[in-house]
Design a protein with these regions (language model features):
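C-terminal alpha-helical interaction appendages
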Residues: 1-75
Length: 75
């Protein structure tokens, strides 16, 4: 996969994750993007070595949800 293809897949995954957050939590667009881009899940997603970018957005979202739930437990 070349860099342009990788970036396209990443953009599609982020778009889906943001949409899932908006649907599940009624977040404003900017807040949903902030949650995705500041997450450990996003760090793993953009690391080609993890292969996470090859998974479905729904599967990736499960990791993001676990991360978000873990943050709320510490509040």
């Amino acid at each position: 996969m070349n860099e342009n293809e990788f970036q396209f897949v990443m953009d599609c995954d982020v778009e889906s994750l943001v949409s899932f957050l908006q649907d599940d939590y009624q977040l404003p667009l900017s807040e949903a993007f902030e949650k995705v881009y500041s997450s450990k899940t996003f760090e793993k997603l953009k690391d080609r070595k993890t292969g996470l970018y090859l998974q479905s957005p729904a599967y990736i979202y499960t990791f993001l949800m676990e991360e978000i739930r873990g943050q709320h437990k510490n509040d």
